[in-house]
């Protein structure tokens, strides 16, 4: 399965998603590893097996094994961090922010790819998972590393499109309405 096969499965009510999916597939504003690692990390974050399989097939040929592992690690570590830090951020009791997290996250310090790639992937996954504290943290690191706001916006746009693809496929699995 590929991105093209996903597009073929999207119903007419998701025409915009289909067109946006074509746009990111053809987007060349990011480097190859950055782009394909980003798409794979976001696909994992959707928690949709069909989306993950299609993006894995599409992305893996463009990624060294270490880069593929780093993309998978970005989605995985953010699944943990986004829950924890979203809680810390949203809890009325601010004392939680003063407590040690006690979460192992060594992969962030040594991801096996350039730090800016891993940070960009982590930011995009954090956008999917809705953790403002993590978004701010990763954005700060990226901006300090001279990553442009356009690059950050592109990553979040990719995340939004990949997430909407998963939702559209789930919506398309509903039975056809009797009124149709």
UniProtKB/Swiss-Prot annotation:
InterPro entries: AhpD (IPR004674), AhpD-like (IPR029032), AhpD_core (IPR004675), CMD-like (IPR003779). The keyword Oxidoreductase applies. Disulfide bonds join 131-134. Signal peptide: none annotated. It comes from the Bacteria. Keywords: Antioxidant, Disulfide bond, Oxidoreductase, Peroxidase, Redox-active center. SUPFAM superfamilies: AhpD-like (SSF69118). This is Alkyl hydroperoxide reductase AhpD. It comes from Beijerinckia indica subsp. indica (strain ATCC 9039 / DSM 1715 / NCIMB 8712). The gene is ahpD.
């Amino acid at each position: 399965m590929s991105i093209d096969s996903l597009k073929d499965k999207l119903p007419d009510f998701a025409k915009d998603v289909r067109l946006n999916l074509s746009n990111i597939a053809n987007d060349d504003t990011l480097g190859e590893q950055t782009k394909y690692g980003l798409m794979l990390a976001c696909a994992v974050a959707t928690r949709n097996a069909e989306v993950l399989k299609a993006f894995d097939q599409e992305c893996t040929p463009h990624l060294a094994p270490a880069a593929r592992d780093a993309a998978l690690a970005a989605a995985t570590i953010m699944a943990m961090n986004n829950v924890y830090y979203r809680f810390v951020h949203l809890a009325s009791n601010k004392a939680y922010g003063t407590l040690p997290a006690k979460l192992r996250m060594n992969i962030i310090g040594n991801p096996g790819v350039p730090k800016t790639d891993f940070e960009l992937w982590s930011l995009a996954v954090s956008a999917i998972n809705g953790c403002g504290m993590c978004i701010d943290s990763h954005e700060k690191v990226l901006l300090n590393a001279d990553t442009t706001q356009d690059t950050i916006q592109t990553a979040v746009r990719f995340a939004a499109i990949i997430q909407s693809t998963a939702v559209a496929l789930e919506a398309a699995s509903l039975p056809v309405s009797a009124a149709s």
